[in-house]
Amino acid sequence: MAALGRPGSGPRAAVPAWKREILERKRAKLAALGGGAGPGAAEPEQRVLAESLGPLRENPFMLLEAERRRGGGAAGARLLERYRRVPGVRALRADSVLIIETVPGFPPAPPAPGAAQIRAAEVLVYGAPPGRVSRLLERFDPPAAPRRRGSPERARPPPPPPPPAPPRPPPAAPSPPAAPGPRGGGASPGARRSDFLQKTGSNSFTVHPRGLHRGAGARLLSNGHSAPEPRAGPANRLAGSPPGSGQWKPKVESGDPSLHPPPSPGTPSATPASPPASATPSQRQCVSAATSTNDSFEIRPAPKPVMETIPLGDLQARALASLRANSRNSFMVIPKSKASGAPPPEGRQSVELPKGDLGPASPSQELGSQPVPGGDGAPALGKSPLEVEAQWAVEEGACPRTATALADRAIRWQRPSSPPPFLPAASEEAEPAEGLRVPGLAKNSREYVRPGLPVTFIDEVDSEEAPQAAKLPYLPHPARPLHPARPGCVAELQPRGSNTFTVVPKRKPGTLQDQHFSQANREPRPREAEEEEASCLLGPTLKKRYPTVHEIEVIGGYLALQKSCLTKAGSSRKKMKISFNDKSLQTTFEYPSESSLEQEEEVDQQEEEEEEEEEEEEEEEGSGSEEKPFALFLPRATFVSSVRPESSRLPEGSSGLSSYTPKHSVAFSKWQEQALEQAPREAEPPPVEAMLTPASQNDLSDFRSEPALYF
């Protein structure tokens, strides 16, 4: 028996374990279906299957794995349990974020003498996947002001800070532990995200809703929506407040940026002494590769307009101001004049002038800088536009390649510092121009009626310099001694290639005379007289005189500047002109009468009668509609006696009703013979009055006999 049992046990022992398990499961299934063939083996098998196929959410291995991935779920659970028991504290848990805050409106209970006071001052974020934290913060934060998309340094306006309290002690430490950060009473308006987030690990950080308290010496730079005052900072900063050396950011917040700073009447030495290309690093960091190597102009963020300075009735100005305030991608391009032999102070002046001095020629600064003129026409800003215009004229006007032009430039730079010879002419012409507007500017901008409305309309932007506008500073009479030095400098500036932007306004020839009368109070005649002198002096070298651009403000431009007009080589685009010829309107809408159409048809038929007589006789039965060579002619009854050569008006010979025959009812040859017989009678028609009724019942649609249609 033992020998017989060995071979039986041999193959059983040779079966692998996995196969044996499969066989046992099959037996268990068969026993369950067959009514218990092997109850002893089926019971433990059923128990094992029930344990292994439980719900996955309650599986201890899955729970452990989820807690391990969550990164210290036990510590987070302990924190959640602890703060849920505190009255007046609300704890929220979303994935891997635990938010603890005070319930708004809960009456604060008097704290125990030895108990620590808990405030909603931190949000612990641990092990957060990228991209989820910002959405959760936006979800649980109070509604904030709209922000720019795509800027990583956008500022988060803090919620109203609760009353000051001692910082809470660190509770049971989560993993990784949040480093306690110093907290102040409130974040400054220009705080960055780093003021609210404190990184504690590779993917963990602590959020401080009230912001971190930064040092008093630290200068805050913001790149997003912070406040309306810092938005107008770089364009409205005084020339006497120099910024730091390394603070050329797109958004520089001055300490107290006033919206209406008086222009500095000082000399160009009051400009901050910074290197000439100090404005270019921010440009190279913030614009696309198409303009990054470009030192010809400087790109700055456009200042926000101030709605209080715009009158309520000016709908166009307010609409434009709201467009500028809400545009997400607005910037300002300031061309820089390239002076190769100029000393460094003048190069700095060319970079710093548009923001240092507030002149009326910059449309981007009007809404924020020009005050509404009061009762007296000339406020305290009366002499500053003259200085600014003299400086701008020198900045673009001087020929940088000749020594005489440099000497002329130095002479012009000294003129604004000594304003007494210009003050009589300035006071006379600044009063009708409302203090901020000068007659030189009134010629090119008739829309300078309100100080809050920008007036620059750019039709074309060329990359060549317009030296004729640059040589004339915007001074009425005292600028005339500068004329003799102009032609020699213009001959030097004939080759193209300088990077001064030129505005080419499209104007009709008659608008210059219209501006004489419409702006008599602003006295633009000295400027135009100078233009005539300049055109006579320059001769055929220059076609027209155009004002050069100091600033170009782009409102809501492209995200990539490589698509904008600033980087295109040529500005000539295909223009479609839609015009209406007023002289041809009458002939366009004048339709010929039916009698004239009939006469034209008769002449054509007489010419073609010999050629087509045979073919038309064959087709006379079914060719009623094909007999008409003129498309507009309708087969109606014809008054042969009323057809006149000059009968474009009422046909007077409408008495021959008995002689009319419908054209389609007669053969063509007979009808033509009848028409030829009636032709001699057309010369002397009988003077019979016209009938005011339709010709016949069959001809109700033919109203040739009604004179009302022909007068």
Swiss-Prot record:
Compartments in which it is found: Cell projection, Stereocilium; Cell projection, Microvillus; Nucleus, Nucleoplasm; Cytoplasm
Biased composition (Pro residues): 157-180
Gene Ontology cellular component list: cytoplasm; microvillus; nucleoplasm; stereocilium; stereocilium base
Compositional bias (Acidic residues): 597-624
Transmembrane segments: none
Keywords for this protein: Actin-binding, Cell projection, Cytoplasm, Deafness, Hearing, Non-syndromic deafness, Nucleus, Phosphoprotein, Protein phosphatase inhibitor
A Pfam family matched in the record: Phostensin
GO molecular function: actin binding; protein phosphatase 1 binding; protein serine/threonine phosphatase inhibitor activity
Family under the similarity heading: Belongs to the taperin family.
Assembly and oligomerization: Interacts with GRXCR2; the interaction restricts TPRN to the stereocilum basal region. Interacts with actin ACTB; the interaction may stabilize stereocilia. Interacts with CLIC5. Interacts with PTPRQ. TPRN, CLIC5 and PTPQR form concentric rings at the base of stereocilia and may form a complex. Interacts with phosphatase PPP1CA; the interaction results in inhibition of PPC1A phosphatase activity. Interacts with DNA damage response proteins XRCC6/KU70, XRCC5/KU80, PARP1, TOP1 and TOP2A; these interactions recruit TPRN to sites of DNA damage where it may play a role in DNA repair.
Function: Essential for hearing. Required for maintenance of stereocilia on both inner and outer hair cells. Necessary for the integrity of the stereociliary rootlet. May act as an actin cytoskeleton regulator involved in the regulation of actin dynamics at the pointed end in hair cells. Forms rings at the base of stereocilia and binds actin filaments in the stereocilia which may stabilize the stereocilia. Acts as a strong inhibitor of PPP1CA phosphatase activity. Recruited to sites of DNA damage and may play a role in DNA damage repair.
PANTHER family registered for this protein in UniProt: TAPERIN, TON-B BOX DOMAIN
Disease tied to this protein: Deafness, autosomal recessive, 79: A form of non-syndromic deafness characterized by progressive and severe sensorineural hearing loss. There are no symptoms of vestibular dysfunction.
Protein name, UniProt field: Taperin
Organism: Homo sapiens (Human)
Gene name of this polypeptide: TPRN
